């Protein structure tokens, strides 16, 4: 199985790559190749039982996502994001990475066609809910983002759902509560 991690140089991406390298399997299938991508070249995990390729580019630039999915990865972890504070401070950059990059990735997968239907794991955020919200958030709770970042992630979730509904890929979204930008 070929795995692609977009955002592999970030904290979550590094931890994920290390865990996959340690396990060597995902969902009962052996990992044979990993492509690790970020805006800066990520490190390949040590002692991986599979081949790792590391790439650096801005995935929101035209044509970059097509290059990333050309190898037809079976599972794509889309972890790349401009976090909330920076997305608020630099409106254009937030939308370019968090929304345009996501849209280009999904469109590049769709453009391959020919029965290609990877599993997409999209990381979202509780920022899609705004505030205040209850301690336990049920499926019926509406998304009402109060920030540009929350809006970008909410739109990403809707796109993920629609592309999955149309059968272009098998998508799953994970809403992360809070991510520390730097470990420690």
Explain the meaning of each model-derived region.
Residues 6, 37, 76-80, 120-126, ...:
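SDR active-site strand-loop-helix element
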Residues 103-147:
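Conserved Rossmann-fold NAD(P)-dependent oxidoreductase catalytic core, especially the SDR/UDP-sugar
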Residues 157-182:
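Conserved beta-loop-beta element that borders a ligand/cofactor-binding pocket
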């Amino acid at each position: 199985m070929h795995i692609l991690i977009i955002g592999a140089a970030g904290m979550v991406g590094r931890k994920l790559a290390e865990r996959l390298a340690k396990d060597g399997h995902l969902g009962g299938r052996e990992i044979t190749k990993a492509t690790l991508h970020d805006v800066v070249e990520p490190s390949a995990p040590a002692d991986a039982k599979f081949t790792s390729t590391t790439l650096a580019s801005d995935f929101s630039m035209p044509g970059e996502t097509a290059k990333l999915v050309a190898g037809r990865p079976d599972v794509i972890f889309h972890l790349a994001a401009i976090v909330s504070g920076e997305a608020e401070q630099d409106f254009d950059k937030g939308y370019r990475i968090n929304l345009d990059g996501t849209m280009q990735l999904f469109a590049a997968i769709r453009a391959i066609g020919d029965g290609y239907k990877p599993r997409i794991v999209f990381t979202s955020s509780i920022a899609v809910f705004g505030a205040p919200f209850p301690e336990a958030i049920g499926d019926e709770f509406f998304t009402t983002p109060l920030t540009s970042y929350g809006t970008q992630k909410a739109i990403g979730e809707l796109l993920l759902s629609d592309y999955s509904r149309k059968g272009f890929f098998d998508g799953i979204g994970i809403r992360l509560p809070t991510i520390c930008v730097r470990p420690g």
